[in-house]
C-alpha cells in the first residue's frame, strides 16, 4: 500500500519540485559508502538533544496578530524539566548532491528542525537524530530512472532505527515519548512503528505519534486494522498511545484526482484524518505558527504584509488567532484536513496565508499545503501533548 502511495508522490514531484531539482541537477556526486553504521553515541550525530546549544536552541518568539491588527508579543522558552521526550524525524530537505545525505547538517536541515520541531521543547525533551535521508537529488534520480524512493528500506530507515534503539537503551529510562514526523520522516516512522513498536512492550511508552504529510490506512468504521494493528487514532487530548495524522489542503483547492495524499488502494480501508483543532470531530480553530518572512521547509514564499498598516514585525514567527479553521473532510478523491482561511479583505490583518507548493506561478494542487502541514497545527499539538502528558503520567502512577 505505501509503495503505491509513494509511486504517486514520485510522479508529481518532477513538476512540483522542479525549481529545487534545478539546483542539484548538474551537481550529483557519487554516493559515499552507506554500509557503515552511524555512531549515535557521538553527539554530532544528533541535531537536537536535551541541554545543548544546538538546532533546537533557537529564537521562537512570536508576534500575535489579532483580527483588529493589534500586535502582542509571545515569548517562548524550552522546559529543561519536561517529564516526557519527543523523537523527531525530519522530511526530505537535504540539498546534498548525493542520493543519500551525509551526516553534516546543511542549512535546510537546520531550518526544518527550527520550523517543525524545536517548539516542542517547551513540552518534552527533544531528540532529533541526523540520518542519511534520501535527498532532493536522490528523489530526482529516482524520477529519471522511473523508480520509487524506498523510504522505508536502506540507510535512511536503518539510521533512524539505530538512533531509536540507541535512544531507548541510553536516554529513555522508561519515560513516555511522542513520535513526530513529516513526509519522508513520517514514512520512516510508520515503518519503525510497524517493525519495532506496534504490539511490542515498548508500545506502552508511546504517549502519541504525530505523523503528518503522509497517509495512514484504517479499516472502514474503525481506528485500527490497517497500517497499525494496535495503535488507534486519537479522538481526545487525554487519550494516549494513539496516532494523529493528516495531510492539509485549502478549502478552496481540495484534493484533485491525482492527489498525493488521503487515499488508499484497498477498498475496505480509508485514509485516516485527525483534526488537532477538534480531535473529537467537527471544525475548530487552528493555532498556527507561521514564518514572518515566508520561510518554508523548502524554499520561500512571499507573504502579504501581516497588517494593513505595515507595522514592522521583528520576531521570526507570527500567530494569527481566528484566521484559520480546520475540519477533516472527504471528497470523491481523498480524505484530508480542510483548511479554511477566514480572512476579511477589508480588515486590518492579512486575509490569506502562504504555503502552497508552486511550479513557477502554478499551484500544485495535488500537494495541498504540504509545505506548512506542521506549521498549521503545531500550537494545537503543543496543547494536546501537554494534556496527553498529564494523562500518561497519571496512568503510570497507578
Language-model features, listed with the residues they occupy:
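Positively charged n-region of N-terminal signal peptides that target proteins for export
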Residues: 1-4
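C-terminal segment of classical bacterial N-terminal signal peptides
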Residues: 13-23
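Sequence/structural signature of beta-propeller domains
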Residues: 26, 77-78
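N-terminal module-boundary/linker segments of secreted carbohydrate-active enzymes
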Residues: 28-74
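Active-site catalytic motif of lipid deacylating hydrolases and related acyltransferases
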Residues: 44, 50-52, 78-82, 88-176, ...
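Short His-Asn-centered micro-motif
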Residues: 89, 180-182, 209-213
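Surface cap/lid and interfacial helix-loop subdomains adjacent to catalytic sites
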Residues: 154-173, 194-359, 391, 395
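Gly/Ala-rich beta-loop-alpha elbow adjacent to hydrolase catalytic centers
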Residues: 181-185, 189
Amino acid at each position: 500500500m505505501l509503495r503505491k502511495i509513494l509511486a504517486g508522490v514520485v510522479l508529481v514531484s518532477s513538476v512540483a519540485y522542479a525549481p529545487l531539482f534545478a539546483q542539484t541537477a548538474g551537481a550529483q556526486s557519487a554516493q559515499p559508502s552507506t554500509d557503515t553504521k552511524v555512531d549515535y553515541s557521538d553527539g554530532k550525530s544528533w541535531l537536537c538533544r536535551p541541554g545543548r546549544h544546538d538546532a533546537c536552541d533557537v529564537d521562537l518568539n512570536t508576534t500575535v496578530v489579532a483580527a483588529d491588527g493589534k500586535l502582542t508579543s509571545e515569548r517562548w522558552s524550552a522546559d529543561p524539566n519536561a517529564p516526557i521526550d519527543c523523537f523527531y524525524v525530519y522530511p526530505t530537505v537535504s540539498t546534498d548532491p548525493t542520493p543519500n545525505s551525509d551526516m553534516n547538517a546543511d542549512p535546510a536541515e537546520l531550518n526544518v528542525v527550527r520550523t517543525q520541531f524545536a517548539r516542542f521543547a517547551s513540552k518534552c525533551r527533544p531528540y532529533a537524530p541526523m540520518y542519511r535521508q534520501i535527498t532532493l537529488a536522490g528523489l530526482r534520480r529516482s524520477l529519471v530512472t522511473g523508480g520509487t524512493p524506498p523510504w522505508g528500506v536502506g540507510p535512511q530507515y536503518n539510521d533512524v532505527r539505530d538512533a531509536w534503539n540507541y535512544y531507548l537503551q541510553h536516554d529513555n529510562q522508561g519515560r513516555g515519548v511522542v513520535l513526530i514526523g513529516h513526509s519522508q520522516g513520517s514514512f520512516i516512522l510508520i515503518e519503525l512503528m510497524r517493525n519495532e513498536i506496534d504490539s511490542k512492550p515498548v508500545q506502552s511508552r508511546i504517549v502519541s505519534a504525530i505523523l503528518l504529510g503522509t497517509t495512514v490506512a484504517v479499516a472502514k468504521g474503525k481506528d485500527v486494522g490497517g497500517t497499525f494493528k494496535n495503535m488507534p487514532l486519537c479522538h481526545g487530548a487525554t487519550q494516549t498511545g494513539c496516532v494523529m495524522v493528516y495531510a492539509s489542503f485549502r478549502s478552496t483547492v481540495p484534493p484533485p484526482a491525482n492527489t498525493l495524499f488521503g487515499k488508499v488502494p484497498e477498498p475496505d480501508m480509508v485514509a485516516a484524518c485527525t483534526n488537532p483543532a477538534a480531535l473529537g470531530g467537527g471544525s475548530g480553530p487552528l493555532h498556527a505558527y507561521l514564518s514572518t518572512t515566508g520561510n518554508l521547509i523548502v524554499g520561500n514564499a512571499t507573504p502579504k504584509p501581516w497588517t494593513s498598516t505595515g507595522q514592522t514585525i521583528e520576531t521570526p514567527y507570527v500567530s494569527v488567532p481566528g484566521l484559520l479553521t480546520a475540519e477533516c473532510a472527504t471528497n470523491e478523491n481523498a480524505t484530508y484536513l480542510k483548511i479554511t482561511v477566514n480572512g476579511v479583505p477589508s480588515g486590518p490583518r492579512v486575509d490569506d496565508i502562504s504555503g502552497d507548493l508552486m511550479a513557477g506561478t502554478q499551484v500544485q494542487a495535488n500537494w495541498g499545503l504540504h509545505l506548512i502541514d506542521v506549521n498549521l497545527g503545531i500550537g494545537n499539538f503543543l496543547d494536546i501533548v501537554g494534556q496527553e502528558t498529564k494523562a500518561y503520567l497519571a496512568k503510570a502512577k497507578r
